[in-house]
Amino acid sequence: PLLGRIKWNQQPYYNTYCPIGTPVGCVATATSQIMRLYKYPKRGTGSHSYSSSYGTLSFNYDYNIDWDAMPESVLRQRNDEVARFCYGVAVALDMGFSPSGSGTWQQYVPAALKKYYKYPSNVQSAERSSYSYNQWIALVKRELDAGRPVQYCGGGTGGAHSFVCDGYTSNNYFHFNWGWGGM
């Protein structure tokens, strides 16, 4: 799998900077893991604030991101660099923090990556419903073959979950990192 040993989570200690008792959120966790793979950018840009049920949440992206201080594996103790980074990604996505589960729209990811993290203009999202089954499988494989994990979102009327597709076998079995510390 492309993410290799990167197995981050939404809860302690990734959520240290989030409102008390709330997880980082699956969209932010999936995005953060992919960014950790690339170790890009070295520095963010700008700042962002929004109103939430916890008051105004803000983050200044104009700081040097110390990727090497962010372990790939599940945190067993507090790591401010990882927690700060994950919170920044969550704020960039206007995360709706809640103790029962934090959420936002995955469609916000490309704009946030471009605006606060200097990602190129060709970063985009795609909807499975816009493709036939075979076209979709071919698209996902092309991205993976190019070394680009695919941030996926799936769900139904009871909610949704964002996760990362980071590999496949010759039998079309796909590997997913669920963002739950190794699952």
What are these regions (language model features)?
Residues 22, 27-34, 105, 109-113, ...:
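Stable alpha-helical elements in mature extracytoplasmic
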Residues 179-183:
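Conserved catalytic-core surface of thiol
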